[in-house]
């Protein structure tokens, strides 16, 4: 990566501004999944060990009006982070700017941490965070000593005041360890993969993945398709899909992708289906691509798993984004499990999960430690897989 990293700058005695991704699920004031906090620890600890004073910024959820602030404070995160670091984390509830915040920042000593309140509290008055208000970026930058560390891959595809805005107003904007790893794994996999390189794309909508499919058809040796978007590809070929999910306005796109794929695009050959998405009374397996009338496909079948297993044999690089079925339901998780088994058994494979539902599937089904890398950013990893430049990354200082 041709950008400066946190190891390239002198941190001792400096007030270091750090954008982290602490956008974690919180229910009744309790964090239900702290993976993103854990992922940021190496960078935070490094800054503190080097004698820096860490000033952390993060958003939590969406905040559009005053009422949305309820339940969106980073207070539970501050407490969780303090426990993980084994030291106090300064935090002022509800405060994202002003004299009280400035006094707290200026009272920091070497090796101490302050977490600023949810950056999206600034969105209540004119979306200042989300629209990258220049005055806000300049103000937040003024709290530090000219060094900004971006370690929030999950928001790197957004141009916000707390990443791009601060970057524009500091002497050095550098990557943290998490951001560096994310870019190294995902970009390297797409731009310079060890071959054979197989991409697996699932999820419900073709529309979400058009750019990714187009880019990966150029870069990968094979692209396997599963999940709900399978049925848009099926219908584009005139195959009966029953009541399965379909994007009627994307049938031409699906057809065009199939035509230009030169056989690289591999689709399922059977389905596990039900007579309703949620309150179903009948589940059955259908041999062949067609789905029976009155039913909808909710997972790939055993022949598809075997076909994908064969396609993955010998793969040295695998990028997976999107489950094969409704994995949250035990009736429809066999496809996702089968594909994970097929990936992780390949000797010497570099296996990367592109965040989102795939990451949730690997974690919930006990496969997380079997993959080389699980991305912390769904949207950001999708844009990297699409070949796009990420604003948060572009704003960093060149080496």
From Swiss-Prot:
Binding positions (ATP): 209, 297, 328, 355-358
Any GO molecular function: phosphoglycerate kinase activity
Keywords of this entry: ATP-binding, Cytoplasm, Glycolysis, Kinase, Nucleotide-binding, Transferase
Superkingdom classification of source: Bacteria
Coarse class of the protein's main subcellular location: cytoplasm
Positions bound to substrate: 21-23, 36, 59-62, 120, 158
PROSITE patterns: PGLYCERATE_KINASE (PS00111)
Record's protein name: Phosphoglycerate kinase
Species of origin: Streptococcus thermophilus (strain ATCC BAA-250 / LMG 18311)
Native organism taxonomy: Bacteria, Bacillati, Bacillota, Bacilli, Lactobacillales
């Amino acid at each position: 990566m041709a950008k400066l990293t946190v190891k390239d700058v002198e941190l001792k005695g400096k007030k270091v501004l750090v954008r982290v991704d602490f956008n974690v699920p919180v229910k009744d004031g309790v964090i239900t999944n702290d993976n993103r906090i854990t992922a940021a620890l190496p960078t935070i600890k490094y800054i503190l060990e080097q004698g820096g004073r860490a000033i952390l910024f993060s958003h939590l959820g969406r905040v559009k009006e005053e009422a949305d602030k309820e339940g969106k404070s980073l207070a539970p995160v501050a407490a969780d982070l303090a426990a993980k670091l084994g030291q106090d984390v300064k935090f002022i509830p509800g405060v994202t700017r002003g004299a009280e915040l400035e006094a707290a920042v200026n009272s920091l000593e070497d090796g101490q941490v302050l977490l600023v309140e949810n950056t999206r509290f600034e969105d209540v008055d004119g979306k200042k965070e989300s629209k990258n208000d220049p005055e806000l970026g300049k103000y937040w930058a003024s709290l530090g000593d000219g060094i900004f560390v971006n370690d929030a891959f999950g928001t790197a595809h957004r141009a916000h005041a707390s990443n791009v805005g601060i970057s524009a107003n500091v002497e050095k904007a550098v990557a943290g360890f998490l951001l560096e790893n994310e870019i190294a794994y995902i970009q390297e996999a797409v731009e310079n993969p060890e071959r054979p390189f197989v991409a697996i794309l699932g999820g419900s909508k073709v529309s979400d993945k058009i750019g990714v499919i187009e880019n990966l058809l150029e870069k990968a040796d094979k692209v396997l398709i599963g999940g709900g978007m399978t049925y848009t590809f099926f219908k584009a070929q005139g195959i009966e899909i029953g009541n399965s999910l379909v994007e009627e306005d994307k049938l031409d796109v699906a057809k065009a992708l199939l035509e230009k794929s030169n056989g690289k695009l591999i689709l399922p050959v059977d389905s596990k289906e039900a007579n309703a998405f949620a309150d179903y009374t009948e589940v059955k397996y259908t041999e062949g691509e067609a789905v029976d009338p009155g039913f909808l496909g909710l997972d790939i079948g055993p022949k598809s798993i075997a076909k994908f297993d064969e396609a993955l044999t010998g793969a040295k690089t695998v990028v997976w984004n999107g489950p094969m079925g409704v994995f949250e339901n035990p009736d429809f998780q066999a496809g996702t499990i089968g594909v994970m088994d097929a990936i992780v058994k390949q000797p010497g494979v570099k296996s990367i999960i592109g965040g989102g539902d795939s990451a949730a599937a690997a974690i919930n089904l006990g496969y997380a430690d079997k993959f080389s890398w699980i991305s912390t950013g769904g949207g950001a990893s999708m844009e990297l897989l699409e070949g796009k430049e990420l604003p948060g990354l572009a704003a960093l200082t060149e080496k």
